[in-house]
Amino acid sequence: MISKTEITRDWLPRYTGTQIEEFGNYILLTNFSNYVSKFADRFDCKIKGKGCPMQTATNDSGLSIINFGMGSANAATIMDLLTACNPKGVLFLGKGGGLKQSAEIGRYILPIAAIRGEGTSNDYLPPEVPALPSFKLHKFVSDTLLEYGQEYRTGVIYTTNRRVWEWDEKFRNKLISLSAIGIDMETATLFIVGHANKISRGAILLVSDQPLLPDGVKTQELDKKVTGKFVDMHLEMGIKAMSDIDGKGEEIKHFGY
C-alpha cells in the first residue's frame, strides 16, 4: 500500500513546481499572489509554480513563501504536503474580517485559538480538540510585532467554509454570540492539520473589513486600499519573525507529541 510519505513527496513538487530540497526550513503561507511577488522582488529570487495550483519563492537564507489559495480544503492540503519537507515552523499571513470594534481595519490579529466552523478539520482530529497555534512560535511573533510598534489584537478566530454570508442575519447573530474577534476561512484548519502532522504553526491576520457593520463589508475599493496601506508591513513582519526565530527565539519544537 502506498504511504502518506510517498504521496506527499510526489505531490508537493506537483502542486508547487518546487522540488522538496528547494524549500527552506521556515515557511510563510499566504492566500495572495502579490505577497509572493513582493517577497521575490525583495530578495531577487525566482517565483516557481507558475501554472501550478500553488506558487512559491525561497530566499538565500532558507525562508520560503507559498501562495496556497483560498479556503480550508487548500489549507489542509498544503499542511499535509509540507510533511514532505518537514519545516521547522510555518506562519500564515492571512486576511480576515474584524467582528469586534477593537478589530479595526488595518489591525493585526494574533489568534490564540480558532473555532472549527469549517468542517475540514474534522477529518483530522475529533471536534473536541481545540485549534491552537504553537505557543513558542506565537510568543516570538508577538515580540516581533511589538518591535514594529504594532498594537496588535488577540482573541479567537471563527473559521468558516462560507465566503458569501454577510447577508445572512442568522449567521451574523451566531458570530456575535460566539464572541470571536474575527472570521476567516483557513486558520482553524491550518492549526488542526499542523497539530495532526506535528508541524509548528502560527498566524498573523490582517483585518481587511468589518462585515458586521453596515458599511463594513469588503468591496473591491476597500480591498485595494487595505492592500496598498497595510500589506507591505504584514509581509515585512512575517519575514522578520521567521528569519530571526532560529537565532533569537527559543526552541519551538522541544516538546514531544
Annotate the PLM regions.
Residues I181-Q210:
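A C-terminal functional module that forms or caps the active site or interfaces directly
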Residues T83-A84, I176, H195:
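Non-catalytic positions within long, well-ordered alpha-helices that form the structural scaffold/packing
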